Regions:
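Active-site-adjacent structural segments surrounding the nucleophilic cysteine of cysteine proteases
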Residues: 1-123, 163-165, 170-173, 196, ...
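Noncatalytic regulatory segments and standalone regulatory/sensor domains
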Residues: 29-34, 43, 167, 173-178, ...
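Sequence-level motif detector for i,i+2 pairs with an aromatic at +2
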Residues: 57, 154, 237-238
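Extracytoplasmic/secreted envelope proteins and their assembly/folding machinery
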Residues: 75, 79-87, 105, 122-126, ...
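Secondary-structure boundary/capping residues
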Residues: 95-96, 138, 156, 200
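Short coil/turn linker and secondary-structure boundary residues
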Residues: 99, 120, 142, 212-215
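Residues that form generic nucleotide/phosphate-binding pockets
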Residues: 107-111, 128, 132, 150, ...
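Predominantly the structural core of cysteine protease catalytic domains
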Residues: 115-188, 192-194, 234
């Protein structure tokens, strides 16, 4: 079968992203500016837009959690990779491109040194980002409206899942050791957008080609629930983390 075409155009900052993937319809994504988190008041600037865009895509740069290919030594660095992606986006890298592997690896090593444990709860991920990277954070219920609201505020979402729960057959052991301990593991990734078909876009650092993976809302919720059932020490329920500058 011939390869299907992909056409995309993006405007940096607040703008519009036109995308055509395969034989489906063209999707027109908007790219909102980042709205700071107001920690002292529910200021209007921190409230979700009244009219949500039908589709949002944030051009968050990507790195796998093993940017130099050393996966055996990078089994527990999904938190770091997720933070690297979001941190670079908040600091102005709206390229949506692959981060230089050596730059990403050095940043992952730095965040590893800051981690209080090998595997972190979502609250601990926020605390690491706040203490060491200077970002305000909020833990938000992972329902459709809240996810779309936060993305429409220009904030990527960091989500805790279990890998096989994502339904992505590219994960090791998906077809041979489905949902078995040691194969389907706790994991963090970044949600960068949504469209009118209730599809969400992921930057998944657990795969070398995890950039721009599309997943249904129900499948994403299943992956979150799967984490909570298999890893009760990380159980926070259906929630996600957002980072942004504080005002």
């Amino acid at each position: 079968m011939a390869a299907l075409g992909v056409v995309a155009m993006i405007a940096i900052g607040a703008g519009i992203y036109f995308a055509f993937f395969g034989a489906g319809p063209q999707v027109t994504y908007v790219t909102p500016d980042i709205v700071p988190i107001n920690l002292s008041t529910t200021a209007p600037s921190d409230q979700p837009p009244v009219d949500l865009p039908s589709a949002v895509l944030l051009p968050v740069p990507f790195t796998p959690q093993a940017p130099l290919g050393n996966w055996a030594a990078r089994q527990h660095t999904c938190e770091e990779a997720s933070l690297v992606m979001v941190d670079r986006y908040l600091r102005g890298d709206h390229s949506g491109a692959l981060i230089d592997p050596h730059t990403a690896d050095a940043a992952i090593n730095q965040i590893t040194a800051w981690k209080p444990a090998v595997d972190l709860t979502i609250e601990q991920v926020g605390e690491v980002a706040n203490k060491n990277l200077g970002w305000a954070y909020q833990v938000v219920p992972a329902d459709r409206l809240s996810m779309k609201q936060q993305l429409a505020l220009g904030r990527p979402l960091i989500v805790g899942v279990r890998t096989h729960g994502l339904g992505n057959p590219n994960y090791p052991g998906y077809s041979t050791h489905f949902e078995q301990p040691g194969w389907s593991v706790s994991h963090y990734l970044v949600v960068t957008g949504y469209d009118q078909a209730d599809t969400y876009v992921l930057n998944d650092p657990g795969l070398t080609r995890g950039h721009g993976y599309h997943i249904s809302f129900d499948q994403l919720m299943h992956a979150i629930d799967d984490l909570d059932q298999a890893y009760p020490n990380l159980n926070a329920g259906r929630v996600f983390l957002v980072l942004a500058p504080a005002v």
